[in-house]
Amino acid sequence: VTHLFKTQNHIFTTDDLKLTLQNLGIKKGDILYIHSEIFNFGIPMINLHDLQKNIIDCFFEIIGNEGTLIMPTFTYSFCDNKVYDKLNSKTRIGVLNEFFRKLPGVKRTNDPLFSFAVKGAKEKLFLKDTDSCFGKNSVFDVLTQQNAKLVLFGGRYVDHSYIHYIEEHMKVSYRFYKNFSGEIIDENGNKTNKDIMYYCRHLDINSETTIESVLKMLVQDNNIQSENFANAEISIIDIKRFFETGTKVLAKNEKALLKQENKNAMCIQ
């Protein structure tokens, strides 16, 4: 047993973490898509490298060899006119994600804007090339088909990028397809040119979804379970249900999840 975090009156161990994950219904064979903010938890009791390694190990112990772990490693490279170097382009979101992608056996997807790191029994399903960041065969598409679970590790406000998959599926009018081109360097140092479509926001109109409105939808649908752990929360969301509810809500009113919209627009009838 390894000590992970301490709070004012308690020490949280790897056993505590595994129990918390099991209490959330995580089990052998699960496909987990994890967004994390590990600095929301208590005071680390071991160095950052060991802390991150122990957290990843806990997840794999619960989901087993038959499970699959996925984390976003977004770089937005082509948006910034940069080369996407699969080995060396740092992720812009979260230290745990960056740690995970560098572990032995972890593969990274080819998307030069929204890449993901993946390891596990079903990793091949997630490594397909796609024409559009959030379109057919994208990681979000496969997560939905495979009944994966979204884990918010460190609080409910960690991320809501999955909503963009729903927005693209519904072809909301406040977004549009834009082509991005650039150069990819693969694991072996080979360079290729790549084009990819990204369903971007129209910046001149109200087009920004808020985490609050997405959360409200998930709570109303009873599709977010949370457990307290070391002064923060670990939450789990059923991705397929997220998709089904999100498409219903946007079919009724495509602006329902946007900033400054009518607060009553969010009923799921």
Show which residues each predicted segment covers.
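N-terminal and secondary-structure boundary signal
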Residues: V1-Q269
